[in-house]
UniProtKB/Swiss-Prot annotation:
CC cofactor: a divalent metal cation
Name by which UniProt lists this protein: Bifunctional enzyme IspD/IspF
Enzyme nomenclature, EC number: 2.7.7.60, 4.6.1.12
This protein's record includes keyword Secreted: no
Gene designation: ispDF
Site (Transition state stabilizer): 27, 36, 281, 380
């Protein structure tokens, strides 16, 4: 059967994908950032860059990302965006088993084709993805590979050269390796059933089960990050590619709410016992309201009242988490990354200190950023003005966001 055109593939079915990212990356050494798939290259986690290549491809539907059971927090930090077509799968003790579990997670959907990719190949390009899918048929899988160009030597046990190996017909395999879904799942299940764990890639399992695999030209850019030096070179490459003055934007927000009878206030999404509550159309979370305005300001996107007018009854009593997550979504959709948020609460009471850790964590969860990028401070008004008279609470917020591109001249 001949390879299909991209248009034909799009009409017939979107391919699914399995991104395998459950390894420990021991050869890359230890890092405070975690295993190598979570290390930063060009200020972005390796896995986040890898995943984006697949979410950006219109020919790919559901994506199963297979991660280690201990890595859920690392994943949320690396990939704060929520993608409707991405599912998280807990991996197994080996890459082969993690791949099988990723394939099983797609079983109810039963896609026509599936691409299986290493999570630490972050430079996979759209052209290669499209060529792989275009060459898939129900009768064959596709393996991107590069013809071996270096002279190959076989060494004896003592390290001395034993013989030279012909390069003719030899290729270095890459990923994603793509297959008709049902046959490759069946092959993995058969290997699992007899405890065969010695396959070095998915194409080898396909060969074992006599699934035809077509080799197409891979990409020299599509390198696998194995060693610490690979990660260093990848980071250097990206920084050189983007050696321009970054588009760093800062937004400010201010809000104030008065007290009324009640038994708690809500600040940064955390309920704090108090002798009064804040008066407002929503939950009156003065901190989140100020921060929402600050984030919107980095896009010139108006203020909280523009997006959630107090005249609209649907926002009566609403949790302000809705507002801040909406603002963060606007930032992300523009390619922005939140570098830092700073909130200052101005109040005589209640005391903020005992609740600062919970408030910080709440903001981390809402914005998908690390705790060292969140600052929450409190001060009194030295008994001056409405704050000094304990009539309400004010908040000032600042957000710093990095957007793609450079500052225009």
């Amino acid at each position: 059967m001949q390879a299909q055109s991209l248009a034909e593939v799009t009409v017939i079915s979107k391919a699914a994908a399995v991104i395998v990212a459950a390894g420990r990356g021991e050869r890359a050494g230890q890092s405070a950032e975690g295993p190598k798939q979570y290390r930063l290259i060009g200020a972005e986690a390796v896995l986040a860059r890898t995943l984006r290549a697949f979410t950006d491809c219109p020919l790919i539907g559901t994506i199963a990302v297979v991660i280690h059971p201990d890595d859920h927090a690392l994943y949320r930090r690396a990939v704060p965006e929520k993608h409707e077509n991405v599912i998280l799968v807990t991996g197994g003790p080996t890459r082969q088993e993690s791949t099988r579990l990723g394939l099983l997670a797609l079983k109810d959907e039963a896609p026509q084709y599936v691409l299986i990719h290493d999570g630490v190949r972050p430079f996979i390009g759209q052209d290669l993805l499209e060529r792989i899918i275009a060459n898939l048929t129900p009768d064959n899988g596709v393996l991107p590979a590069l013809a071996v160009s270096d002279t190959l030597k076989r060494a004896a046990a003592d390290g001395m050269v034993e013989t030279t190996i012909s390069r003719t017909g030899l290729f270095a395999a890459q990923t994603p390796q793509a297959f008709p879904y049902a046959p490759i799942l069946d092959a993995h299940e058969k290997a699992f059933a007899i405890n065969r764990t010695d396959f070095t890639d998915d194409a080898a399992i396909a060969e074992w089960q006599e699934i035809a695999v077509r080799i197409i030209e891979g990409s020299a850019d599509n390198t696998k990050l194995t060693w610490a030096k690979d990660i260093e070179m990848a980071d250097k490459r990206l920084r050189q590619d983007h050696a321009v003055f970054p588009d760093i934007r800062t937004g400010n927000g201010y809000d104030v709410h008065s007290f009324e009878p009640g038994d708690h206030v809500t600040l940064c999404g955390v309920k704090i016992p108090h002798e009064a509550k804040l008066n407002g159309h929503s939950d009156a979370d003065v901190a989140l309201h100020a921060l929402t305005d600050a984030l919107l300001a980095t896009r010139g996107a108006g203020d909280i009242g523009t997006h959630f007018p107090p005249s609209d009854p649907q926002w009566k009593g609403a949790a302000s988490r809705i507002f801040i997550e909406h603002a963060a979504k606007i930032v992300r959709e523009a390619g922005g990354r939140i570098a830092n948020v700073d909130v200052t609460l101005i109040s005589e009471a209640p005391k903020i200190g005992p609740h600062r850790a919970a408030m910080t964590q709440a903001l981390c969860d809402m914005l998908g950023i690390a705790a060292d990028r969140v600052s929450i401070k409190a001060t009194t008004n030295e008994k001056l003005g409405f704050v000094g008279r304990r009539e309400g609470i004010a908040a000032i917020a600042t957000a710093t966001v990095i957007y793609p591109g450079e500052v225009p001249e």
